[in-house]
């Protein structure tokens, strides 16, 4: 991130606190009930969105000229000091447990892998999966050793471009076409520093970045109040939500066709106006260094909109071949995109 001189209060940077009641799809709304307000709730929301993308295998969108086809996988980066509540993001991982259990497919790719091992796992998982790390210690060592190779993989993943590697030692060739990998990485500023060392290569502009600037306040509800034999409310809730999401995954898989996400003409014009305005503000503050983040944020925003729309589709009906973004989800993706831009600065 660039050190910003913009005068922003903490409240200005929050996402969930600025959402209206019931603005999110029901599954996300319920899943967020385990988190307190403020940054903790925001971190959980970004984890939920990143993980839910895997459960929407049929969703697609077009972007750019000429049109490029994108699926909903997000690359998300949370930067936070120690003891700031990053562990809340592990709840997002629970949402995919039913998919793993019902299909026998492995979803998660270990983040503590070398770049070569990461490619092997992607190949083994048929180019689909989630790289998940709430503490980046081991990955940081990988980045220091093979930053260029990791950066190349991330750049290809963002655009779903073919990733390939030839290992000279055993003449092994790996090629992964149309990779659809989501990433949720988090760590302290020192842990993520290797990713930030070269702003000009555009690597960080491919991530939805969220920065926590303060430690958690002490919570006087941390004491154990459960009686022996109780099943925690959170476990029961996430078991049910995981089952619902697993059903949605199978519904899309069985449809055997894709569902394209579109914005209305009015929504497209609103985004154009928003980014013209944002471009003027951030260009004056940061010059050309922020260009890549501004130009890639519309893709990230539309991916978020695609996830929201996919979670709202009625599973009692056949999967549609196209869906127009609702005004409700459009306002949500605009808000999240705007806040993420502020954090990227």
Where would I find each of the regions flagged by the language model?
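Phosphate-handling catalytic cores of nucleic-acid transaction enzymes
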Residues: 1-345
